[in-house]
């Protein structure tokens, strides 16, 4: 008899679950259908459909089949991909009161600790206070240009190091970017050769890119897995999370303590951190400043490394664009000095070239997901509360309806001429949308310009010729939140004896 009751109870439970599911789906249908997408499996959803590399290309192909708004589910978690920039504007800007939050990312946020930084921070009071710290110092183009001397000095050093060792280009790009951000954020000047602080923060930023990649860790979809013991086979990701958390903790604390020590000694170089500490903030405000400074590095360093690396790859592959930019620099600046940020408005082609670097290979091909704080009906589709809504930045910037010949590198597209209007400024896309737009966009823009302009002024960048054979670089990029060109070879030589003298004389002048 007990077995009979057990069977009846089990059957009733199954019927109840089925009934609740039907009711839920009915309510969902009454509010509107979910956006279309690939058909998933029971319970696991579309887990077998998700791409492991170059997700943006897969999502773009889904858009061609299902439309500009595509949805999938992973273990019940709704994910929406936007393949139209207009939908991104309509949702993230016009309805920013709904779409300004971030999802809870268990691995990167709760386990590693990146949820203290601006990119991952949930929308609310702390988010607004952190953004205010940025806007006070680098919130406008004029504010960002206050740091022009930092930028120009570090790029000067970059030119000297590349002249001495051109085969170490990508290593020097990373070191220079780290030097710029560390000086601006903390007043820290990097050492010659390998610098332990640059190595530390670079490692942490790389870990950020890996840990925030959608679908990289199952615990993001099934948060209960965070309670699995680290010793269980297959749970090596928990040990990884602890190592990454330690790296992030040091990244936040070590340079911050350096600035405090320098201020106490009266030797601090003006920086983001020192400027905010001068007001003697209370302990809670100090934590906010510390995390904001870490945000400046985590958001600015790796993205700039990617963009400057892409610049050198583009110049290797598109020599005609390089020659046009150099001709403009020669005509406007001459050959007796290097370009500065003050020259930017006089160099429209070089500026357009920098924009094309951002468009051709965007540093963040798949934008960080926004998360609606309540159910929304958009374009006739239901976007449930808590959905991960990701803008496909790659698709936006390679849409043939917006950009002619979108896969070619053509800076001219951004320069109006008789009978031709300029194409859309990619900075309106690559730096994000609405209340989550990058607060360091003016600084990033300035950093890319000065790196490109100074390099073009003194270097010829070309394909490597080995044993009489031209080595064609492969245009291939890594997956992850921040995408980088895979290592490539290029030849870098001084444009002239005068250019070489200009680099070395500049360094000798600074040493006197």
Swiss-Prot record:
Q: Please classify the protein's predominant subcellular localization into one broad category.
A: membrane
Any one cellular-component term (Gene Ontology):
membrane
Extract one GO molecular function annotation from the record: iron ion binding
Q: Which InterPro entries match?
A: Cyt_P450, Cyt_P450_CS, Cyt_P450_E_grp-I, Cyt_P450_sf, Cytochrome_P450_fung
Q: Which domain of life is it from?
A: Eukaryota
Where do the annotations place heme binding?
438
Cofactor(s) it depends on: heme
Read off the PROSITE patterns from this record.
CYTOCHROME_P450
Query: Keyword Transmembrane: yes or no?
Result: yes
Membrane topology (UniProt): Single-pass membrane protein
Q: In which pathway does it act?
A: Secondary metabolite biosynthesis
Q: Which CDD domains match?
A: CYP64-like
UniProt subcellular location: Membrane
* Record-listed E.C. numbers: 1.-.-.-
Transmembrane portions of the chain = 4-24
Q: Which UniProt keywords apply?
A: Heme, Iron, Membrane, Metal-binding, Monooxygenase, Oxidoreductase, Transmembrane, Transmembrane helix
The protein's job, in short, is: Cytochrome P450 monooxygenase that is able to use 7-ethoxycoumarin as a substrate for oxidation.
Indicate the family of this protein: Belongs to the cytochrome P450 family.
Protein name (record):
Cytochrome P450 monooxygenase 208
Organism, scientific name: Postia placenta (strain ATCC 44394 / Madison 698-R)
Gene field: CYP208
